[in-house]
């Protein structure tokens, strides 16, 4: 029992841990294990020098995603944080999204965006919706807004197609996202709703707003009814603010109200419902007799709107005829509409023939002269254009009287006349207008061909301006081309009949069996076949639907015929009937599908439809079934309504109703409860742009908010709707409208034209509308009086905060009547007279943030918490300013500026941040830092920021002293300085003496001799010493006397004037000779390409290529050198040559023989080599282990062969390696020992990308795999206008990765001296330690001189004025002939001295 209890307890603990893990999901932050290092062997620390603002250990996978790639367009010594040559105030920066773990302060960048994020809202613990002016998200083309799922990193697009504009604002309401802006969607404007669960976007029920409208803000007022069910609590109203004056469904704004006044003249537009359907003649065959026009013109007149005409030959009768397509033959038309041309010519008498019965049709029509029904057959009259329009004009004058007949409808605007001529069903009507007359067919005759014969004409020829046929049945063909409208321009109309093949392949029966004539239909043999037919049922009423099935005898398919399932679906997707139909009928047949009521549908998204799908075959075992689809016919039995009516402002129809409009100007209240059972048919009945307003049209209320909207001018614009917290009584709530306002009403006046402050009294749950107190006072002045404060400019944005709100923008706020009534948050709430750009309003008091005015329109705000500190971030036009709201002060350190526009906390442990740059780097320091015991610290070097500086080189001298160099400045030091290793935090010391550096001079290499007496500096430009000596190439500094030596080497240069470089120096201790390598070819006047030896003892340059018994020549650029024997140096570089032989990667120089050679095994490396490290102390034969890096490679040498070890490095155009070292592990490891011992690990520094990890500046290699170690950051800043005062935000920045140029350690493997191989005691002599320590600590040359006065004579008695005692010249040297070049060189030296 106890065991079972223990097992159960362990299970519960596991479940609890699992739940906690889910709650604090750190799956995004996978830790990276770092090896433990022994810092004692590296001088107790690892120095990192370069170009950066901050550093972090690479603690988790993708740690460095918060930094961007470096800007390769900027020079390595032109810092990205110093790109300040732009004065633009609209500089655009890319934005990013960051996931931050609040608990561990980890940050992960998971998205790059090519624009600004303006809104960011949490949808769930795993998803957010973001909106802004971006079109690309992680290089994926998108339309804003989008939904981003964090765990899967998937983007859900709300809009998949172009919306011809942009979404300016979004509002999240549970499962719905309201979208507002200036866009077009689904033929509606400026508003839409996205359902998060269904993943579908829809038009709003009110069909958005009018063309050229714009929605800038959306908010919600809850109904506040505590007694309603929980699911009803979220109703209330949605408020839309922007610039608009109508709704997309504008009839919602017209109320049909009862009126006692029945004598006012009715100016309504009336329209009879035309339920009859236009028969498509588009694919008919057109012929004519005695036609003057072409057959093309004969076909074109079936689309009268194209303004084409068909003319008979002059002074001659003629015939125009159309033969229907085979599948349409036998149709029963109900009327023809004949269009009359303008001008003197036209048809006076005509007759209509029908085929195949070849008979003259009996016709009935409305005689325009009497407006009575008339009949004709062989001699039917048409009026000419002028006479017809006289009658139409007369109708306009007598419209009121004519419309008293309920079966007659006269349009009061254009005088068109219609009446029903089937009083029982009222499904057919007849009429005329200014350019046509209609003629109904008395007999119900099936026709294959219809012809119009011209008997008499007006003028000198008969002309047809158009011809249309109608029927009172709705026929949908399976062959969708037969559903095409007569006019191509109507092809996209939602009211067209159409057929959609859902699955399967359908063909014309005539294409399968050409012998079949006089009929055509679709055939398929696919067993998954399905087709849907959409009849144009535009009006609600009773319909009878039948389906026609062709007989199998026509095509001989009886044995193969199929069984089909036919389903009738209503416009609300309800299944109305289902039929199983056997298709093996020999002759044509029809089946009843449905009889009953159908709702009229106006769009393809809510249409009645008939679905036909394959079920099986009548005969079992048939392998090639034969499913046929011909047509479906919906016959109109009766309609619910028979007329439409539309009216303008305050007019009356004949039944005593008045149409009262609701006026909108930039503000609209959308009641969710009112629209919960919305049906557009309860708004109006619409046909041919003529509208009748329903008495039930009460969806949009004339609420006090809509009333306020109507009383604003039509130039008003609302930029923001802001709702304050509810007041103590629980009902009243503040409503702030920000924008540009004027009032057109005498009933409402405004105290300013920027902000309207309202109070929501309550929400009326009966009328489903918001009750507000309307403003009623006018004060117009240049300044804006808002809540007791005077603003000299408009507020751009309001931000709701708990118990208060913020106003931000390009303004200055002063106290009422200039008083000091404003409190300064940055100065213990002391009274001040003004606030600039940002102001907080709380408890009837305005507060300032203590900043000076900045000429910038701040329009973005976000607040977030970092390291338990709340920050406010204000931004606009690329400028950011960060306020520490816990300590009430501005953040002035640029490295701590939060360039964020949005923040959203998604759970207790994580938040999403959006902006141009964000950093939670672990350690802030400019260009220098060191690691000791696994933590960052920094040297006593205060490099001046915002300059193009970089520390590029370093040299560890001994336990007391290190030297750094580059191109940098501190308060007292320039380009080179001395660091105390015993106290690294102590202030850096400068070199003593007068020194003037050239503008572009850079310390490229450093070396201190084995006796720690001389500091050799390799420089690429001029240096003036002690106001008289100009040096380029090598500068020598006396560390003992703390002064520049009085002897300095002749300058290094290029004979063609090109810049030089001094990349490496090594010292041959025995001969006291310094070997210098780089890119140059002259030392003074001495030819000395690539390599030159400086004889320290004799203070002269020697060309090593001419110093041997046999002259040798070398070429290329030397980049690195190291001793491998006490008298031999291994040299590498770019494009090295020896005696004209190219392709050499490594050279060997022997100081004893003054000769050059190569070792074949080393030169088998395929890549270029810039630097290398010898990883074995005993490597006399160069068969030890090595590692080398080049521009695009890192390779290891096992003593015999080279092998690439950089498979995990991704090479890009910015990839750069700068330095490498061997570090010591805290404990021996089981690492691969191919390239170094198991107690060591290799590190390389620069800037590069590691596979699976991302950007790094420093990585470790354990012999098998790479481990990211350190990455840095650097703010890229650009000027964006002037700013002053505390917290000045005149610069916008983006976080990029920095550079590590040099690793400073006590390096046992640098081998820059032949004595380095001896592993001698490197400690300074007692006198030197005391002297240098005091010099570094105190910087006092006077004290240094006093301390050295005694040991100087004892220890350095052979030195005078910095010179070594010259060695005796041997007799054999005196016997050699003097080289003229050397003689000239000696003359140069004496001249310089």
From Swiss-Prot:
Residues 1-21 form the signal peptide. It is found in: Cell membrane; Cell tip. One of its GO terms (biological process) is cellular bud site selection. Disruption phenotype: Leads to randomly positioned branch sites and reduced bipolar positioning of secondary hyphae. The keyword Transmembrane helix applies. The keyword Signal applies. This is Polarized growth protein RAX2. It comes from Candida albicans (strain SC5314 / ATCC MYA-2876) (Yeast).
């Amino acid at each position: 029992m106890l065991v079972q209890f223990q097992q159960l307890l362990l299970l519960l603990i596991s479940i609890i841990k699992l739940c906690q893990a889910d709650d604090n999901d750190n799956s995004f932050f996978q830790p990276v294990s770092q090896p433990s290092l022994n810092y004692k062997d590296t001088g107790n620390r690892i120095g990192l020098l370069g170009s950066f603002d901050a550093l972090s250990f690479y603690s988790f996978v993708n740690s460095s995603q918060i930094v961007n790639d470096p800007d390769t367009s900027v020079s390595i010594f032109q810092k990205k944080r110093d790109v300040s040559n732009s004065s633009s105030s609209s500089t655009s920066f890319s934005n990013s999204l960051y996931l931050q773990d609040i608990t561990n302060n980890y940050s992960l960048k998971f998205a790059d965006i090519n624009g600004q994020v303006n809104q960011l809202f949490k949808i769930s613990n795993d998803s957010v919706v973001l909106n802004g002016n971006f079109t690309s998200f992680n290089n994926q083309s998108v339309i804003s807004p989008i939904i981003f799922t964090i765990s899967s990193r998937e983007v859900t697009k709300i809009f998949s197609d172009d919306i011809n504009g942009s979404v300016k604002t979004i509002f999240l309401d549970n499962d719905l996202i309201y979208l507002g802006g200036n866009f077009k969607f689904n033929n509606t404007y400026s508003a839409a709703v996205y359902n998060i669960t269904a993943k579908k976007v829809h038009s709003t029920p009110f069909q958005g707003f009018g063309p050229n409208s714009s929605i800038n803000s959306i908010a919600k007022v809850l109904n506040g009814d505590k007694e309603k069910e929980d699911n009803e609590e979220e109703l209330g109203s949605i408020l839309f603010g922007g610039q608009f004056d109508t709704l997309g469904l504008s009839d919602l704004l017209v109320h049909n109200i009862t009126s006692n006044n029945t004598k006012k003249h009715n100016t309504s537009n009336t329209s009879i419902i035309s339920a009859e359907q236009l028969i498509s003649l588009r694919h008919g065959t057109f012929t004519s007799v005695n036609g003057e026009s072409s057959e093309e013109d004969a076909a074109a007149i079936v689309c009268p709107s194209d303004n084409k005409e068909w003319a008979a030959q002059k002074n001659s009768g003629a015939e125009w005829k159309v033969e229907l397509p085979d599948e349409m033959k036998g149709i029963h038309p109900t009327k023809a509409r004949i269009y009359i041309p303008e001008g003197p010519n036209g048809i006076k008498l005509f007759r209509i023939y029908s085929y195949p019965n070849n008979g003259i049709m009996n016709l009935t029509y409305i005689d325009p002269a009497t407006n009575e029904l008339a009949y004709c057959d062989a001699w039917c009259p048409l009026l000419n254009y002028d006479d017809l329009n006289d009658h139409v004009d007369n109708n306009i004058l007598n419209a009121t009287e004519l419309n008293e007949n309920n079966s007659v409808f006269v349009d009061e605007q254009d005088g068109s006349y219609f009446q029903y001529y089937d009083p029982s069903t009222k499904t057919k009507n007849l009429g005329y207008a200014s350019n046509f007359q209609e003629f109904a067919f008395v007999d119900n005759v099936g026709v294959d061909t219809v012809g119009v014969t011209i008997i008499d004409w007006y003028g000198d020829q008969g002309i047809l301006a158009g011809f249309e046929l109608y029927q009172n049945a709705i026929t949908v063909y399976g062959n969708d081309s037969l559903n095409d409208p007569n006019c191509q321009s109507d092809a996209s109309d939602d009211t067209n009949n159409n057929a959609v093949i859902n699955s399967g392949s359908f063909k014309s029966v005539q294409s399968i069996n050409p012998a079949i004539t006089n009929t055509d239909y679709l055939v398929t043999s696919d067993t998954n076949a399905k087709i849907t037919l959409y009849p144009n049922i535009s009006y609600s009423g009773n319909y009878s639907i039948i389906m026609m099935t062709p007989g199998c005898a026509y095509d001989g398919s009886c044995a193969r015929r199929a069984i089909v399932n036919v389903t009738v679906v209503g416009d609300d997707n309800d299944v109305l009937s289902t039929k199983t139909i056997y298709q093996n009928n020999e002759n044509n047949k029809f089946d009843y599908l449905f009889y009953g009521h159908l709702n009229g549908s106006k769009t393809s998204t809510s249409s009645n439809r008939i679905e036909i799908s394959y079920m099986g075959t009548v005969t079992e075992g048939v392998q090639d079934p034969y499913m046929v689809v011909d047509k479906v016919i919906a016959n109109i039995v009766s309609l619910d309504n028979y007329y439409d009516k539309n009216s303008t402002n305050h007019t009356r129809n004949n039944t005593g109703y008045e149409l009262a409009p609701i006026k909108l100007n930039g503000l609209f209240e959308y009641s969710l409860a009112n629209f919960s059972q919305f049906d557009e048919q309860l708004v109006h009945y619409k046909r041919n742009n003529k509208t009748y307003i329903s008495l039930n049209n009460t969806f949009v209320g004339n609420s006090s908010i809509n009333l306020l909207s109507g009383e604003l001018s039509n130039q008003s614009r609302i930029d923001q709707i802001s709702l304050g917290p509810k007041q103590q009584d629980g009902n009243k709530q503040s409503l702030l409208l920000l924008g540009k306002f004027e009032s057109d009403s005498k009933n409402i006046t405004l105290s300013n034209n920027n902000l309207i402050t309202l109070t929501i009294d309550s929400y009326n749950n009966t009328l489903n509308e918001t009750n507000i107190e309307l403003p009623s006072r006018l004060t117009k002045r240049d300044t804006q009086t808002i809540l007791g404060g005077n603003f000299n400019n408009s507020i751009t944005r309001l931000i709701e905060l708990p118990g208060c709100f913020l106003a931000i923008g390009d303004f200055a706020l002063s106290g009422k009547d200039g008083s000091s009534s404003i409190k300064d948050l940055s100065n213990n709430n002391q009274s001040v007279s003004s606030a600039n750009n940002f102001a907080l309003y709380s408890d009837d008091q305005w507060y300032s943030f203590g900043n000076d005015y900045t000429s910038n329109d701040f329009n973005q705000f976000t607040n977030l918490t970092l390291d338990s500190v709340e920050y406010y971030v204000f931004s606009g036009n690329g400028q950011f300013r960060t306020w520490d709201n816990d300590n009430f002060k501005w953040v002035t350190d640029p490295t701590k500026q939060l360039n964020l526009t949005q923040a959203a906390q998604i759970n207790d442990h994580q938040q999403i941040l959006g902006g141009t740059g964000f950093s939670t780097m672990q350690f802030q320091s400019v260009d220098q830092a060191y690691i000791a015991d696994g933590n960052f610290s920094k040297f006593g070097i205060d490099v001046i920021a915002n300059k193009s500086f970089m520390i590029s080189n370093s040299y560890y001298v001994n336990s007391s002293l290190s030297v750094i160099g580059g191109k940098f400045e501190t308060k007292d030091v320039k380009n080179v300085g001395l660091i105390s290793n015993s106290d690294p935090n102590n202030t850096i010391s400068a070199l003593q003496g007068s020194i003037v550096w050239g503008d572009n001079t850079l310390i490229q290499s450093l070396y201190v001799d084995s006796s720690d007496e001389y500091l050799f500096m390799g420089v690429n430009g001029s240096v003036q010493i002690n106001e008289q000596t100009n040096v380029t190439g090598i500068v020598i500094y006396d560390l003992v006397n703390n002064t520049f030596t009085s002897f300095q080497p002749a300058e290094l240069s290029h004979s063609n004037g090109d810049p030089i470089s001094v990349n490496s120096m090594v010292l041959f201790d025995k001969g006291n000779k310094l070997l210098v390598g780089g890119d140059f070819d002259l030392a003074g006047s001495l030819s000395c390409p690539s390599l030159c030896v400086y004889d320290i003892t004799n203070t002269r340059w020697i060309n090593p290529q001419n110093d041997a018994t046999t002259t040798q020549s070398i070429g290329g650029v030397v980049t690195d050198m190291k001793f491998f024997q006490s008298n031999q140096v291994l040299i590498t570089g770019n494009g090295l040559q020896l005696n004209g032989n190219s392709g050499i990667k490594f050279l060997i120089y022997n100081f004893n023989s003054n000769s050059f050679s190569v070792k074949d095994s080393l030169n088998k490396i395929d890549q270029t080599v810039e630097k290398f490290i010898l990883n074995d102390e005993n490597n006399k034969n160069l068969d030890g282990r090595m590692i080398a890096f080049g521009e695009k490679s890192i390779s290891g040498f096992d003593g015999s062969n080279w092998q690439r070890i950089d498979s995990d490095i991704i090479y890009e155009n910015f990839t750069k390696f700068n330095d490498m070292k061997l570090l010591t592990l805290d404990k021996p490891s089981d690492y691969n020992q191919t390239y170094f011992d198991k107690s060591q690990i290799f590190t390389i520094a620069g800037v590069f990308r590691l596979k699976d990890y991302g950007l790094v500046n420093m990585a470790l290699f354990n012999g098998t795999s790479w481990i990211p170690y350190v990455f840095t950051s650097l703010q890229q800043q650009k000027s964006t206008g002037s700013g002053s005062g505390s917290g000045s935000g005149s610069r916008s920045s983006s976080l990029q990765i920095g550079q590590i140029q040099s690793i400073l350690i006590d390096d046992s493997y640098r081998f820059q001296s032949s004595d380095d191989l001896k592993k001698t005691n490197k400690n300074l002599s007692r006198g030197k330690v005391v002297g240098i320590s005091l010099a570094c600590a105190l910087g006092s040359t006077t004290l240094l001189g006093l301390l050295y006065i005694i040991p100087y004579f004892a220890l350095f008695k052979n030195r005078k004025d910095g010179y070594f005692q010259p060695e005796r010249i041997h007799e054999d040297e005196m016997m050699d002939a003097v080289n003229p070049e050397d003689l000239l060189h000696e003359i140069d030296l004496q001249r310089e001295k």
